[in-house]
Amino acid sequence: MIVNQALIELTKQVAVAVEEIKFSPNSTSNNSTPTNNKLKSSSSSISNCDSPSSKSKSNSSTSTPTSQPQTPSQLPQQAQQQAQQQHYSANSMNPYYAQQVLLQLQKPSTFVKHVHVVVKNTPFGITLRSKEPLQFNFQNYVIKATLLYDSDPPKMVDFIHNEPLQYVATVSEDGSEVCVDVKVGILSSQHQGSMFLVVLHISHCSAPTPSNSEPISTILTNIGNNSIHSLNVTNICVVSHPIRIVSKLDHVKKEGIPILKKRTFHEILTDKLKKLQKSQDSQSKWIKNLYQQHGAQYDMEPYNSTLHSQKTDSLCSSSTSTPSFNSTSSSSKNQSQSIKNEEEEDGGEDEEEEGGEDNDNESESSNTNSTQLIGKKSINKLPISTTTSSSNFNNLMVNNNINNNNNNNNNNHLIQNTTFSSTSHFQNSFNRVVEVYNLIPEYERVEVIRKMVQQLKSYDLEQLVSTFIDELKCGYESTIIS
């Protein structure tokens, strides 16, 4: 096997509880007698799986004697079985042990086996991550999972009709991670307390799919291919942590194993924010390097929404806006309300278009006077058309001129209150309509008005006229009251 850093690492394996069991290689395997070797080989072939309870008991310094009498021939066999349970042989065929040796870069004297307890028929996730996404991308590979006994040597889990293992693999968008949701089906009562391994076969799309009964030697070779410097990345195997299956969660509570707590919303949110901050820091470093390469100064000031809004407002106030003549509106009330809102927000934009001499920092009283003067100038400049539509439009503007003259006497009162009445809003809105009318060429005015009347429904047109008349009446009544 190639001893090097792994190309694919197992980053996460979900479980309801995790047990820790220490194991070490058998240092006395070379000095044992031939009879003991025969007993060891026979006991290893008989034992299909290891129970965590027996392993934890075998780790103790002294073993408790049994109450039943034992013959002398049975004592060495039991000692060999206990040694087999607490030690792996030097030439172990266990895939998990081989993977641990590869990850630790040397044969460990002792290592900890993390046994993950899962509930039967309940999915749990196994997350794999590629350390070199450019060299190895999960989107180009097919993943297959098989179930083995965690024994030495390992053994395939037999089944009659339905496979005991079901899985679904989900690859991330960039192909650097894959999450395999695994579910272990119903097993017989003989497997109670047994430990299993999930072997993930990762094969390239061009390579043939591995079989369910893949030889152990091939699995060990593919585990050795899991290296950054490996020349063969067509077939790679990754082994999960040992798994122990229980039928209910209450069994874990009875055994006294601490159950892993579910992550709270606060913990998940904090984790996500840390990941976002980490990615933003890395992006800032890349941007800073690009600025330095081009000899530009990098601004480290963070983004501020208030400053951004002030800059955009200043840009909008400095730029001139061209009013539009909306001829396809569906409701006259919505039209008048939108025009009033635009007049309140834009303030002095009308002065820049027609006056050209007023500044943006004038008071509201000067805005009112200027809009009224604009209305007078625009009305005086209006040409007289021979058509019926243009004459009606001119009569309406003459009436508005009369209202403007009446409202000039109330300017001082409006300045003192520093508020805009509905009449002034209507005047400003009407003046905007007049400005648009002046911008239209004389030979197109009649056609534009005709199209507007045709596009508007009869109900909308009546509502539009009634709204104008109501506004004119309100303005006339306000002048009488003042």
Curated annotation (Swiss-Prot):
Gene Ontology CC annotation, any one: nucleus
GO biological process: sorocarp stalk morphogenesis
GO molecular function, one term: sequence-specific DNA binding
Region annotated Disordered, chain positions: 24-88, 307-376
Comp. bias (Low complexity): 24-86, 312-339
InterPro entries: CudA-like (IPR040430)
Biased composition (Acidic residues): 342-363
Protein name (record): Uncharacterized protein DDB_G0270306
Source species: Dictyostelium discoideum (Social amoeba)
Phylogenetic lineage: Eukaryota, Amoebozoa, Evosea, Eumycetozoa, Dictyostelia
